[in-house]
């Protein structure tokens, strides 16, 4: 089982996302269920290592957001066109 630490995003938009990526992080979102969507930021290198395993896409993951655990599944993963980088992930609540 994968556990990923995440932070709630304070800024949103193209410029904020570019600043995150320059700081070796990337934006993501958690949605689904009866709760409101949560915009988060993740550490790129840690998630990149985890997503190399096939189980990342099929198992329920645990995101720790501000000390609270959220069970999710990876719904959509966006990658850079030619660099080995993740640019965004959509998580759906499990």
UniProtKB/Swiss-Prot annotation:
Keywords: Ribonucleoprotein, Ribosomal protein, RNA-binding, rRNA-binding
Classification via InterPro entries: Rbsml_bL25/Gln-tRNA_synth_N (IPR020056), Ribosomal_bL25/Gln-tRNA_synth (IPR011035), Ribosomal_bL25_short (IPR020055), Ribosomal_L25_dom (IPR029751), Ribosomal_uL5_bac-type (IPR020930)
Pfam families: Ribosomal_L25p
Coiled coil: none
GO molecular function: 5S rRNA binding; structural constituent of ribosome
Gene Ontology, cellular component aspect: cytosolic large ribosomal subunit
GO BP terms in the entry: translation
Superkingdom as given in the UniProt entry: Bacteria
SUPFAM superfamilies, per database record: Ribosomal protein L25-like (SSF50715)
Function: This is one of the proteins that binds to the 5S RNA in the ribosome where it forms part of the central protuberance.
Subunit and interaction comment: Part of the 50S ribosomal subunit; part of the 5S rRNA/L5/L18/L25 subcomplex. Contacts the 5S rRNA. Binds to the 5S rRNA independently of L5 and L18.
Matching PANTHER family: RIBOSOMAL PROTEIN L25/GLN-TRNA SYNTHETASE, ANTI-CODON-BINDING DOMAIN-CONTAINING PROTEIN, RIBOSOMAL PROTEIN L25_GLN-TRNA SYNTHETASE, ANTI-CODON-BINDING DOMAIN-CONTAINING PROTEIN
Family listed: Belongs to the bacterial ribosomal protein bL25 family.
UniProt-recorded name of the protein: Large ribosomal subunit protein bL25
Lineage, opening ranks: Bacteria, Pseudomonadati, Pseudomonadota, Gammaproteobacteria, Enterobacterales
């Amino acid at each position: 089982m994968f556990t990923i630490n995440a932070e709630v995003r304070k800024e949103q938009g193209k410029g904020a996302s570019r600043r995150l990526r320059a700081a070796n992080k990337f934006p993501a979102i958690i949605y689904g269920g009866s709760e409101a969507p949560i915009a988060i930021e993740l550490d790129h290198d840690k998630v990149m290592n985890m997503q190399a395993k096939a189980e990342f896409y099929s198992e329920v993951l645990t995101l720790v957001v501000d000390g609270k655990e959220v069970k999710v599944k990876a719904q959509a993963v966006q990658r850079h066109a030619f660099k080995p980088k993740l640019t965004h992930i959509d998580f759906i609540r499990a």
